Amino acid sequence: VRRLLAWVFVLLIASGAAAAWWLHEPLTTGAEPLELAIEPGTTPRGVARDVVAAGAQTNAQLLYAWFRLSGQDRQIKAGNYEIPAGTTPRSLLRMLVRGEEALRTLTLVEGWTFRQVRQALAKEDQIKQDTAQLTAEQIMAQLGRPGVHPEGRFFPDTYSYAKGSSDLALLRRALHAMDRRLEAAWAARASDVPLKSPDEALILASIVEKETGRASDRAQIAGVFANRLRVGMLLQTDPTVIYGLGEKFDGNLRRRDLQTDTPWNTYTRPGLPPTPIAMPGKAALLAAVQPASTRALYFVAKGDGSSHFSTSLDEHNRAVNRYQRGQSQ
């Protein structure tokens, strides 16, 4: 009897040691992560089979037994996962219980138009294309903003998403992010800023975004536009003309383009255009509501990304001749 008990004891110790070893043994042997998709309603046994089918080097029954013994088998969450090299049965279960799905990223770039945003979303083959057949107006209605122009309404940032996420869901996140940023910027506006509403701040910020080549000039550029708004001067900013031309713009802005009237042409129409012309980032939003204190009414690109600012038309014309026409003073 003693000998039998001794053998039982040895077997228990051995099985316990084997289980402990297995729980810490990597499930994958390759360098590339395994892709695992768990559909809603999949049973724990089905999850174990899916893990093995994805390429894990283990036994499905053994993995299922581990799920059951852990007491967490019913807490496994559906989703799209990546099982990286070195993942053990223990760390796998922790990942599945926490719902740590594999996340991809999409960057919406400062200065992009809504059209460019849609093009970027359409290129993402891991995103569900729920808006592909919708017009811009229909998209805004789906987002709860019927009648609101989509331009500039989405905050440029890098967004993480799980495989199979809806493009509409990502747009909703970007929309709400811009809501928060715009609200914060408007609350921090200077007391003398010549803007009547957050919408006007968003419009001006979009212009500042498109006009700024060097970050250090941003507040100064906003200051020029603020000064022009205060005294009733035309803003005369090329990016608004380009936006108004739409697909007619061929990359070369001509004098006749400046004279072609559109709702966005700030050479032919006073004040701000009716909508933003692009997505402004946080810095452009803050510059629009906290413009630099300056006497400048003009600026011209110097060719190195920076701008030259002038207080008079004569000075501005000399700067244009110098920096854009290559004429000496």
Tell what function each PLM region has.
Residues 43, 119-128, 141-329:
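Bacterial extracytoplasmic/cell-wall-associated proteins, especially those involved in peptidoglycan
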Residues 1-33:
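N-terminal type II signal-anchor transmembrane helix
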Residues 8-10, 35, 105, 299:
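N-terminal hydrophobic or amphipathic segments with adjacent small-residue motifs
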Residues 16-21, 63-66, 86-92, 176, ...:
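Short hydrophobic/aromatic-rich motifs at helix boundaries and adjacent loops
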Residues 6-11, 54-55, 78-80, 130-134, ...:
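N-terminal start-of-chain detector that recognizes signal peptides
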Residues 25-185:
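Signal peptide-directed extracytoplasmic domains
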Residues 2-6, 33, 74-75, 112-115, ...:
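Short low-complexity stretches enriched in small and charged residues
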